């Protein structure tokens, strides 16, 4: 196996498959294509932006048999998994248990490790076992339904209800009234509001603070700390309205001081990785720590077993190191030997969405990129900073690019200051148009004077 890695590095001939079709997938394409080790990129299923870096394949991220056929026919060396669903469904195990696939590097944990994201109850119990700071909680299901009602009725307000399983980012409800909380609890467990994901409910103490996202790449023992980010989930300006997949993100996070980040490392990151080792959970991939800062102390809101979207669009913009080399070091268990280089500049991404999102919306609308010469991407990385138009819900139709999702584009900028990066992204978005296009103009508002 060691000889295989030496051969890969020497010949620089990695064929890489990226799973995903969102802005995160496009960002991975952009970053990985810069590596001297990458000679060919494939993306399943991809979008109009990813096709500029490699070959899009019309395959679902959870169609493991079709992914297997592609990996064999294209002689894939490395699979980068974007979304959580294939990880929770066991794509890592699928590869490692197959003699034709087990030589391929897969970025992600085993199905057991992916339960950190796939089950809120599993994650909370894991944190409790390893003394990782998090909100107090209890869990209930159909059998303990009445007990849960009594618990919620007497719970201090606000109270947080979380569907145990994956619910497309919509499985968390913050309730300010007991009647509201009991109604939501009934909807989740008895009326199957979130389907299978809501068979179990985590009832959690509400923590009042400010949120941020912290990312590491781990080999199950060592790790490298990637740039932190803050995302904006609410659809409307002023952080109002329903939650979305993310309307924008910034990095670095001004309130994440060195002192605070040292607490994150000591109290959250290292106990998590130590816990994975102690419980013999296979985990080689990204860990996304959803944190909240309360009185200068970090608490874990959630784990995710992959990179975030739109956070990836700012995190990788600031990562100057070769991502592919880091992924090889991950597979070899040598991340402790790696020192990554982070750009000191600030990054901001703002997401353009379809009218009606996160509810119903139209697809198939033509995108007008205005004066931008290249509609797929802007490659203007220079001494003043850089601009990237990362595609998410887009599709190539002849000579046109059309909308194909709720979140359509993520315009990301790198500049000397956060206000400058935010303004740069807004200036570019002002040149782009499609019917009903909307974006928040207040991304990073807390940090702009």
Where are these regions (language model features)?
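Generic long, charged, amphipathic alpha-helical segments
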Residues: 367-404
């Amino acid at each position: 196996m060691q000889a295989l890695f030496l051969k890969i590095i020497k010949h620089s001939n990695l064929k890489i498959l990226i799973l995903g079709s969102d802005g995160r997938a496009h960002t991975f394409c952009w970053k990985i294509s810069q590596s001297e080790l990458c000679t060919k990129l494939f993306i399943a299923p991809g979008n109009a932006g990813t096709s500029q870096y490699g070959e899009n394949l019309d395959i679902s991220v959870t169609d493991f048999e079709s992914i297997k056929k592609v990996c064999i026919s294209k002689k894939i060396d490395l699979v980068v998994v974007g979304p959580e669903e294939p990880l929770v469904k066991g794509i890592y195990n699928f590869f490692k248990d197959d003699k034709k696939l087990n030589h391929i590097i897969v970025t992600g944990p085993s199905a057991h490790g992916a339960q950190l994201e796939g089950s809120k109850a599993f994650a909370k119990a894991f944190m409790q076992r390893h003394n990782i700071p998090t909100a107090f909680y209890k869990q209930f299901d159909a059998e303990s339904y009445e007990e849960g009602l009594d618990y919620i009725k007497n719970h201090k307000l606000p109270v947080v209800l979380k569907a145990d399983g994956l619910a497309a980012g919509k499985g968390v409800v913050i309730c300010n009234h007991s009647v509201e909380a009991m109604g939501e609890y009934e909807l989740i467990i008895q009326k199957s509001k979130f389907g299978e994901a809501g068979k179990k409910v985590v009832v959690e103490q509400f923590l009042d603070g400010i949120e941020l996202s912290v990312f590491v790449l781990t080999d199950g023992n060592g790790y490298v700390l990637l740039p932190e980010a803050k995302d904006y989930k609410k659809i409307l300006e002023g952080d109002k309205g329903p939650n979305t997949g993310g309307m924008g993100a910034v990095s670095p996070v001004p309130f994440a001081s060195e002192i605070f980040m040292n607490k994150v490392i000591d109290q959250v990151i290292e106990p998590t990785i130590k816990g994975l080792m102690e419980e013999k959970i296979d985990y080689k991939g990204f860990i996304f720590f959803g944190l909240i800062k309360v009185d200068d102390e970090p608490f874990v809101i959630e784990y995710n077993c992959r990179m975030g979207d739109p956070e990836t669009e700012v995190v990788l913009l600031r990562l100057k190191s070769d991502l592919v080399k880091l992924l090889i070091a991950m597979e070899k268990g040598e991340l402790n030997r790696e020192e990554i280089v982070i750009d000191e500049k600030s990054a901001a991404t703002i997401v353009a969405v379809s009218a009606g999102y996160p509810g119903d919306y139209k697809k198939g609308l033509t995108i007008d990129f205005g004066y931008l010469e290249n509609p797929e991407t802007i490659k203007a990385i220079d001494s003043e900073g850089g601009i990237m138009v990362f595609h998410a819900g887009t599709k190539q139709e002849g000579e046109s690019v059309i909308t194909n999702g709720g979140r359509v584009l993520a315009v990301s900028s790198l500049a000397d200051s956060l206000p400058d990066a935010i303004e740069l992204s807004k200036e570019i978005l002002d040149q782009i148009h499609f019917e009903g296009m909307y974006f928040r103009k207040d991304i990073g508002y807390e940090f702009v004077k």
